[in-house]
Amino acid sequence: MRILLSNDDGYLAPGLAALYEALKPIADVTVMAPEQNCSGASNSLTLSRPLSVLRSANGFYYVNGTPTDSVHIALTGMLDHRPDLVVSGINNGQNMGEDTLYSGTVAAATEGIMFGVPAIAFSLVDKDWVHLEDAVRVSAEIVAHYLEQPLPGHPLLNVNIPNLPYDQLGDWQITRLGKRHPSQPVIRQTNPRGEPIYWIGPAGSARDASEGTDFHAVANGHVSITPLQLDLTHTQMLPAARDWARAGSGAS
């Protein structure tokens, strides 16, 4: 089995190195990750300049671009063989609810799906890496289970792991995305020239953390696994939207 491993925290991130070591015994793993931390890069591709791919002393490949660039280059020109699975992470912090739209971690996995390769994104809730090895153990178990018993089609799974010791983690729960309150206001500061500068404010707290959501599962110590899809069509709105379009079209 072959795995393409990427992330959005950069090729030097502890989560990437730890997950690589855990996956080596179960698959042939190639690492292709961004050079720098690209948290919040979402699915951005670099189209305004050429990209360089280098190899570090530990054998990891890295690109001076985004997480999506990393996986795109690997799948369309660098790898000699098509991987059986794209894995992204482990991210330093959660990717739940609307976070998934901003997440470079999820985006790296999404790029695999764009080329028909199943993908799993892993995130460790909280940002202190205290229980990284525990999260790595769970991640490797999920990957091994998928390789032994694949889901139908080309799944995109978003996994969030509570920052807890392994023996305190609950079972794996299949969840839907919860919802957050809007982000907090930007933080305005002044640079040395007296000009205003802005920092993006912290993410909003959970608004829908009801049973069945990723927020609820993680808050109760469970590993959250959310199947995602690329089709953003609001299917329930289609009938009303068609009526609206016909009314407007006829009026003109």
Curated annotation (Swiss-Prot):
Catalytic activity: a ribonucleoside 5'-phosphate + H2O = a ribonucleoside + phosphate
Gene3D superfamilies assigned: Survival protein SurE-like phosphatase/nucleotidase (3.40.1210.10)
SUPFAM superfamilies associated with the record: SurE-like (SSF64167)
Cofactor-binding details, from the entry: Binds 1 divalent metal cation per subunit.
Signal peptide (UniProt feature, chain positions): none
Compartments, as annotated in UniProt: Cytoplasm
EC class name: hydrolase
GO cellular component, one term: cytoplasm
Binding site for a divalent metal cation: D8, D9, S39, N91
Keyword match Metal-binding: yes
Sorted UniProt keywords: Cytoplasm, Hydrolase, Metal-binding, Nucleotide-binding
Function per UniProt: Nucleotidase that shows phosphatase activity on nucleoside 5'-monophosphates.
Protein known as: 5'-nucleotidase SurE
Gene: surE
